[in-house]
Structure formats: C-alpha cells, structure tokens
Amino acid sequence: MANRSLAPALFDVQDAFKGPYAPRIQAFTEAGQQADLTAAQNDVEKIALILVDYQHDFVDPTGTLYVPGSQQDVARLLTWFYANAHRISSIYASLDTHLPFQIFYSSWWKNPQTGEHPQPYTTVTVDDVTNMKWVPVFQPNWSVSYVHQLQEKAKKDLMIWPYHTMEGALGHMLVAPISEAIAWHSAARNAQPTYVVKGRTIRTEYYGIFGAEIPDPEVPESSLNVTMLDAVMKHDRVYIAGEAKSHCVLETERQLVGRFGNRPELLKRLHFLRDCTSSVQHPTIDFDALANAELATMEQQGVQMVLSSEPIP
C-alpha cells in the first residue's frame, strides 16, 4: 500500500470498516488547515480525482444495495489519497439520489394478471413489455418506449433495483471517512470540491455522473453534461474510483471514453484505480466479468489501469 504520511493524526484506515458515524468535518478541516500544503490553484500539473457514489447503501454491509468488497475499496482509496493529496488539485464526488417512484423501482411496474410488482434484480425486457408481462403504472407510453430505446441505444435491459440511496436517508450519505477526506483536502489545498447529484430524473436511469442512460426530453439536465466532461479533461491526469465498478463507475468511464475516444492523447490522462472499486453481485448475471471485458477494451484504447499501491508519478 502507498505511504500515508500526509494523513492527519485522527485518520484511521479502519474507519472504512466502522459503519455509519457522523463525519468529523470540523476536526478534519482544522487538520487540513495545519497541513502546510500549497494551494491547488498553484499546481503546475493539474490532477482530478473522481469519486463515484461512495455512499452508505453501496459501501456499508447493512446498505440496501451493498457492493461486496467496497469497504476494502474505501480503505485502499483513502490510503492512496492521503499519500498523494498534495498532488490532487480537484475532487468530484457524486451522490446517487433517488425518489420513491422511478422507472427502475418495482413501484413503477406490475403484472396485469396478478397485480404483483417485480422483485429487485428482475430484468424488464422488450419482450416483457411487448407481451405485457410487466406493464407500467406510470407514464405508459414513455416507459414502453424507454425499454425499447435502452435496448437499441445502450444494448441493455431495464434492471429493477432495491430501493437505495433515497434522498434524505442515511443510505444516501457519503461514508464518513470519504467526507472527512474531502473536508481535509478542501482545507489543506484551498480547493472547493464539486459534488455531483445524479439520479433524480424519474423516467430514466442515471449511472454515469455525466448524464442519464437515455436523456429525458422533459429534463434537459439529464443530457450529457459536456461542460463538466470538458472541465474534467482540462486536468493533466484524472483518477477514477467508486462504486459500483459494473455500473456507475463503468458508465462514468464509458462517458469519458465516448466523449474523447477520438483523441488518444486525452484518453491517456484517464487512470482507473482498479483496486478501489467492486461490482454489483447479481444472482445470475456476472456483472464483474462484463465490466472487466469492457475495461480491457478501454485499456487498449489508452486508458491507464492502475493500482492504489502505485504513487502518482
């Protein structure tokens, strides 16, 4: 593991396994103010860190969509982070944010014969909506069209997820040691973090931090956020970590590669922290294998696959 000599005295990597607690923002801010680091605005080489959805529902074992291995991911990420914080100029931290009625929740669909709603991890396919195995409770025309568009444009079926990262609930919070690290870095480097709230568009899925799977024409902000994409890629290096590798992290990477795939000199700026992210476990779908196959293709295109044990050059 990387050296963590910059970590404040109150940091303990075991906090990644501690479970929910109130983040010590004041204490970590004061520690950052005493760290004697230069302001990020003076960095000659600009480095961005994208933290995707390190939230309780994904990271804590009691979370409703717990990703196995995610606590270890956080521990490795934080160790790497405190070893390299003097080089990190910008932090982008996303928060998956949901409401009770959304197209990927069971409340949106039902079986017209039994009245039952689909269970979590059910896939809703084009055949399902054509044969009326599942019918939408809300927005019927859009919902059926969405399932078709998702298959045609994204080559995916609609997945029904457990209720997770509900706005205002504990599961929505970033895990405390991540919040503490961001507060420390903000004070130590005089750098305002960027929080990206995603997922409140009820008629579409929103995995990647830069835009929805299928943009909703009634919600302009669901379209690909090219302004943020371009801002991120103005950095000389971009490091990416978070949960889950198979979904929100992979889609974030996919959006970056999609935007800059014709510029290999920019793709080389992307660094995927592959031991700081894990995949959703599904009863029948090997999401990790699917993610690894696509990441291997991205690596061939120029994306750097790195480990947290490797310091920033």
Explain the meaning of each model-derived region.
Residues 1-50, 54-90, 98-313:
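Active-site-adjacent betaalpha module
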Residues 95:
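Glycine-rich, histidine-containing beta strand-loop boundary motifs that form or position
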